[in-house]
Amino acid sequence: MIHIYTLHFKNDYWVDLQVESFKKHIKVPYKSYAIFSHMSSDIYEKRKDYYDYFEVREKGRHIHKGGNYHPTDGNRHIFPVIKQNLKPGDIVIRIDSDAFFIDDITDEFVNKVQDKKFIAIHEPQHEWDLNYRAPHPAFYAFRGEYLNQGLDSAMGEMSEDGHSNWWGLLIKWFKESNVDWYALERSNKVNLHALYFGIYDNLVYHHYAGSRDRITRVDRKKATELNVELTEIMEENHMIDKDVREQLSH
């Protein structure tokens, strides 16, 4: 059994694409869990039956993207629910709102998670230091038993990792638990942007610009190197984003 969780924040733009990818590509039994935050009651009513478990949370411990609900808040709130449903051999997937599957999730993938213990997207361009190896939280897949071995706490609180990321406790948990996470590497044949619009191991697509300002660390580096305004780069990213969204909607 797969327990797959997502947090949708401020808009429901990606729900249909994501849920359809679950239905199309997950070839093993699964339960879907979602937390929605900072949207209208009409959206909540519309989307509540799209998942096996649906919850609304408007306030967490941390400010994030102009709202008072952070991904760690979502993890902390949903993991107790998932733990109630866990059985031996189950795996858990945490997937960003603007990420979805483009290939099948089969027993082979479940076995791979059991073998590798913890699988995550690896995106060096997300980091200031391109040599720093960090698991990006857009996609995590791990043994369900780890939620009873401290992983729930490690993913449920913000902590600096020394590289301006908030998943420091997860990095610490890896070391303490002797878990060497397995990376899904970027596999794009065409890169419209160094970070955005990523495909990983030909399995997962992550848009990156789904619910945030279209400026990343790589864009800030680019602005400095080219001596151009960030607003110029943001506008360029916005136009590419608009085109990609139009293509995804067809």
Give the residues covered by each predicted segment.
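Short, acidic, metal-binding catalytic loop of nucleotide-sugar glycosyltransferases
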Residues: 20-30
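A conserved hydrophobic helix/loop-capping motif in glycosyltransferases and polysaccharide synthases
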Residues: 3-11
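Short beta-strand-to-loop acidic/aromatic patch adjacent to the donor-nucleotide binding site
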Residues: 89-100
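Conserved catalytic core of nucleotide-sugar-dependent glycosyltransferases
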Residues: 100-172
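C-terminal catalytic/acceptor-binding lobe
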Residues: 164-250
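Short, aromatic/basic amphipathic alpha-helical patches
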Residues: 22, 42-51, 169-174
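Active-site-proximal specificity loops/subdomain of glycosyltransferases
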Residues: 35-88
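Phosphate/oxyanion-binding active-site loops and adjacent basic polyanion-contact surfaces
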Residues: 11-15, 67-75, 162-163
